Design a protein with these regions (language model features):
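Signature of N-terminal electron-transfer/Fe-S-associated modules in redox systems
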Residues: 1-174
C-alpha cells in the first residue's frame, strides 16, 4: 500500500491509502468518480487518458494516466477535464471544441482538451509568430489519437482560440 497526497483541480486529496499497482486512471475513475479521463489503449499511446500536471515552477505538461501508478502522482498538482469549466461556464477552448464539432464519440476529447490548454498556457508565456502557429498546434496535438478522425476539427478549434486572443498568444509582428 502507498499513502497518497495530491491536489486535483485545486482540491487536496489525502492521505489516502492505495494499492501500489493502482493506476492513476483507475484512481481518478474508481476512487474519485472523475470519469472524464478515459482509458483508451492502456499503453500510453493514444493519450485519451492525459491529465495536466502543474509543476511548482509554473510550468505544466500532460501526462498519461493509464500506465502510471497513482503513487507516481504523490505530492503533485494535477488538472483533469472536470477542472476546466468554472461551474456552468465553459472555457473558450471548450466552447471552440463544441463550435467546431471537434468530437464525435468524445473518447479522446479530454486528452485533446488538456493538451490544448497546456499549449495556450505556454503561448501566453512565450508567444509564437503567426507563421509558426499551424506547426506549433500540430506539434502540441501530435501523439493524440482520435478514432473518429477529428484531428482537423481539434486543430481548428485550438487555432480559433489563439487567433481570437492573438495579442496574448501570438508574437507581435516585426
Amino acid at each position: 500500500m502507498t499513502r497518497l497526497n495530491l491536489t486535483i483541480n485545486g482540491r487536496s486529496y489525502g492521505p489516502v491509502d492505495v494499492r501500489d499497482e493502482l493506476s492513476m486512471n483507475d484512481f481518478l475513475r474508481e476512487y474519485l468518480g472523475m470519469t472524464g479521463t478515459k482509458f483508451g489503449c492502456g499503453a500510453a499511446q493514444c493519450l485519451s487518458c492525459a491529465v495536466i500536471v502543474d509543476d511548482p515552477d509554473g510550468t505544466s505538461y500532460t501526462s498519461p494516466t493509464c500506465v502510471a501508478s497513482a503513487a507516481s502522482f504523490d505530492g503533485k498538482s494535477i488538472r483533469t477535464v472536470e477542472g476546466h469549466a468554472k461551474g456552468d461556464e465553459l472555457t473558450a477552448l471548450q466552447k471552440a471544441f463544441i463550435q467546431h464539432f471537434a468530437f464525435q464519440c468524445g473518447y479522446c476529447t479530454a486528452g485533446f482538451l488538456n493538451e490544448g490548454q497546456v499549449l495556450l498556457e505556454r503561448l501566453a508565456k512565450a508567444p509564437v509568430k503567426r507563421a509558426d502557429l499551424e506547426n506549433t498546434i500540430a506539434e502540441a496535438l501530435d501523439g493524440h489519437i482520435c478514432r473518429c478522425t477529428g484531428y482537423v476539427k481539434y486543430h481548428e478549434a485550438v487555432r480559433d482560440v489563439i487567433l481570437a486572443d492573438s495579442k496574448r498568444y501570438l508574437a507581435a509582428s516585426q
